[in-house]
Design a protein with these regions (language model features):
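A short catalytic or substrate-binding loop motif that flags glycine-/basic-rich loops and adjacent residues
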Residues: 150-151, 307-312, 438, 445-448
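An alpha-helical support segment within catalytic cores of ATP-dependent transferases
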Residues: 396-447, 457-459, 552-572
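Helix-rich C-terminal or lid/interface subdomains of diverse kinases
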Residues: 487, 501-572
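Conserved protein kinase catalytic/activation segment
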Residues: 453-465
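PRPP-associated nucleotide enzymes
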Residues: 1-309, 371-378, 395-398
């Protein structure tokens, strides 16, 4: 199934470096404390992206990773930022080392493509955890650090700083997602291999196959490096997933691969201290990640919606000063700050809960004693007001999948999930309707309009939960026309035609422009196919959580039934308005 996608941004390299240099200069004027540390980490993440973009441009030009002069020049200030980050963290945010004077190096490409480091944005990967893990390594020889781009670029510089190693080498594995390889220029390869070195490979993961770590290890082993001289620094302590080959599994089992988890890095006492800056002394913290929040919304487990526990953001229910707050990971490297600005816009419009602020990657939002929303007559009213406000207030911060890409995703998922006959019906549907790309008005769409994402308060009002970042999630969709969310509400609440008409009208009025009906018709089967794929992947990955797998399989059945009915023309099963 096609579900995941990567986020990329192409920028003018010198302009980005100049802006980043100003940000670094501003850090020097900040007082000690967690906010200065946050700013250092934000600059560290941003400069890591720039180095990644330069390295990728060089690889594209030469067909192999070679460590261009521009990349090597930028690794020096990245190392200096790493040292400042370490000094700040180790001194409880009191001290920092000298900050670099950042300038554009010679040989810099005019434009570079920056990849979003997914671990920083989605999976609570903190660079300090890698520093702590690096200190647990037992090395036999001089350390040489290899960072796997994207996120491994900055992390490798940080680990090299911890180990007192020379500047790292960065690589971009290529090939089939489950069987990747790396290629280095002859000069870089010659400088890399030496018998007295202990190699440290840095990346997030491992994922389904562990192929990125494996690609680097295989390259080294093929050139005579012993396995016991190759260590890994991953983001979690688990094994590679079900697509890993036997060699990768054996290599992983025997390697040094220390991990420091977020819970170890951020014990409750440390998190409580940070939060006290926003909400006062903390009385209690309860972890409600992995779907545990459902116990506070639903009376019975039988009513719990499906979740994918390992993909949920870390979140805590916090009590302070007699009030309760939801503290949720929103991303480091400036991600949480950007989402805070969005939350304040939507709260001012009266459609989401109050957000108090952010503290080093966590948003602090007022916890509401609210219940689940049923299939009530007012769904078009509260959903239309919310979607219209979103369309009016939130232009897209980045791009999203084109209609052609959505159609290709849907075609594939339908073929895999429902068979060739229904896939052929979708192909005819696309030909008949066309893909009116020129009519798409991209906004920062919600992309999660499920039943359980809405909160009904005791006074009858309904607010939208989890409304801040799914347009930039680790999936294909991205920013879309508001018709995508309209389709989502119609599908998730199974709206009758008259209710769907009301939703369309209210959304258009609140947005200031009508909902495009042709787009709505085009996007509805695409929405269903995407959710079918996501539910199927969730069900397939939940072998260790059988009760969650049952819920995901029920979602698969629901989306498959709706999609099949829509495309094969079974009357009375699809409620889109005419």
């Amino acid at each position: 199934m096609i579900v995941y996608g990567d986020r990329a941004e192409t920028v003018a390299s010198r302009e980005r470096i100049a802006a980043l240099a100003a940000d670094i200069d501003a850090i020097a004027t900040m007082p000690p404390g967690i906010w200065r540390h946050d700013a250092i980490v934000t600059a560290f993440v941003a400069l890591g992206q720039v180095v990644q973009g330069v390295a990728d441009a060089d690889r594209e030009a030469h067909g192999a990773d070679g460590g261009s002069d521009a990349e090597r020049s930028l690794l020096a200030p990245l190392t200096a930022l790493s040292q400042a980050l370490l000094a700040s963290w180790d001194s409880d945010f009191g001290d920092i080392t000298a900050l670099p004077a950042l300038t554009a190096p010679l040989g810099l490409p005019d434009r570079i493509t920056l990849r979003l480091p997914e671990g920083y944005a989605f999976y609570a990967v903190y660079p300090e955890a890698y520093a702590a893990a690096a200190r647990l390594l037992r090395l036999d020889g001089t350390a040489l650090v290899i960072g796997v781009r994207s996120i491994g670029t900055g992390l490798a510089a940080l680990v090299a700083a911890v180990l007192g190693a020379p500047a790292p080498v960065t690589v971009r594995p290529i090939g089939h997602p489950f069987d990747r390889t790396i290629a280095l220029t002859p000069k870089t390869e010659t400088g890399l291999i030496a018998s007295d070195r202990h190699y440290v490979v840095v990346d997030e993961g491992p994922g389904l196959s562990g192929s990125s770590f494996a690609a680097v290890a295989a390259f080294l082993e093929e050139r005579g490096v012993r396995r016991d001289r190759i260590a890994f620094l991953p983001s979690h302590g688990g094994e590679p997933g079900g697509q890993a080959n036997p060699r990768t599994i054996a290599r992983w089992a025997g390697a040094q691969r220390p991990v420091v988890t977020m819970n170890t890095l951020l014990p409750r006492e440390r998190l409580s201290e940070w939060l006290s800056h926003l909400i006062g002394p903390v009385e209690e913290i309860e972890d409600v990640s992995g779907g545990a929040w459902r116990a506070y919304v639903y009376g019975s487990e039988a009513d719990w919606p499906a979740v994918q526990p390992w993909q949920e953001r870390h979140k805590f229910l916090v009590r302070a000063g007699g009030e309760r707050w939801l503290v949720k990971f929103a991303g480091i490297g400036g991600e949480a700050t950007r989402k805070l600005e969005r939350a304040r816009l939507l709260h001012a419009a009266g459609v989401v809960p109050e957000v108090r602020g952010q503290v080093y990657g966590f948003l602090v939002e007022r916890w509401l004693d609210a219940g689940a929303v049923g299939d009530n007559d007012d769904v078009p009213d509260f959903a239309g007001r919310y979607l219209g406000a979103r369309a009016r207030l939130l232009p897209p911060p980045g791009g999203g999948a084109s209609l052609a890409e959505l159609a290709a995703m849907a075609q594939y998922n339908i073929s895999v999930g429902l068979g060739d006959e229904v896939a052929a019906a979708f192909a005819r549907f696309v030909i008949e309707l066309g893909a009116p790309e020129s009519r798409v008005r991209r906004i920062a769409t919600d992309n999660r309009c499920d039943h359980h994402e809405w909160l009904r308060l005791s006074d009858g009002r309904v607010l939208k939960a989890d409304a801040l970042d799914h347009d930039a999630a680790h999936d294909l969709i991205g920013a879309q026309d508001i018709a995508w969310d309209v389709a989502g509400v119609i599908v998730e609440f199974d709206l009758a035609p008259t209710a769907a008409e009301r939703l369309i009208a209210i959304t258009g009025e609140a947005a200031g422009h009508p909902v495009d009906r042709d787009l709505l018709h085009f996007l509805t089967p695409c929405y269903l196919a995407f959710r079918l794929g996501a539910a199927q992947l969730a069900a397939d990955s939940l072998g260790g959580w059988p009760e969650e797998a049952v819920r995901s399989r029920a979602a698969v059945s629901r989306y498959a039934g709706r999609l099949s009915a829509l495309l094969t023309g079974q009357a009375g099963t699809e409620n889109l308005p005419a």
